Amino acid sequence: MDYIDWDKYIYMSSTSVYNPKHMNTVEADFNGYSNDFVWCNRFEFPYEEIKRQAEYALWQKYSDKKWIAVRYPFAIGKDDYTKRLLFYVEHVMKSEPMYIDNIDYQMSYIRSDEAGEFIAYLVDKDIEGAINGSSTGTISLREIINYVEENTGKHAILSDDGEVAPYNGEPEYSINTEKAEKKGYHFSNLKEWIY
């Protein structure tokens, strides 16, 4: 980035920069000046720290440039190669035990295609710095599991000895998108598409 020039740089960050996420998480909850950045590659630190380091670089080294750091929660959709949400559905369908440590926590998500649409929307908008993107509303894993059970007749097997679920360790949180809404973007309602 030291050798190129740009009108606006849009970086796809993550809500994992927030430590911790909580209900009504706002952009100011992560300060890009709170720590010194370290030049590193993506394998030197855990995912959330890599995202923080990338933002530290934008805030501290490139503060004289126009940039946006778009912070998303888990992006899910047909192209979700992580298959984290599918883990829960498949374990219910196959009656395989799973260990979930946050089954009743409300969490935020965004549709993967909407994540792309929002980045495209920002291209010609007068905005700089961090901005959150997330579907409106939250849902718990229990609500998702209950839906699968009700529509398939299958039952979840929850066990401390079950396979560790991919969203374990996530806190209860929601992502505030008022900044994006003030710029004219309105996110979809999570419960209108998640099922």
Task: Say what each PLM segment does.
Residues 2-52, 67-68:
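Conserved Rossmann-fold NAD(P)-dependent oxidoreductase catalytic core, especially the SDR/UDP-sugar
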Residues 112, 146, 164-187, 192:
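Conserved C-terminal active-site "lid" loop/helix of NAD(P)H-dependent oxidoreductases
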Residues 118-172:
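Mid/C-terminal beta-alpha module of Rossmann-like enzyme folds, strongest
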Residues 58, 92, 179-181:
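Structural element of the ATP-grasp superfamily
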Residues 48, 69, 109, 138, ...:
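Short aromatic/basic micro-patch
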Residues 13, 54-79:
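Conserved beta-loop-beta element that borders a ligand/cofactor-binding pocket
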Residues 1, 20-23, 79-81, 142-143:
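Short glycine-/acidic-enriched loop or helix-start segments at secondary-structure transitions
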Residues 89-99, 104-138:
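Alpha-helical substrate-binding/gating segment
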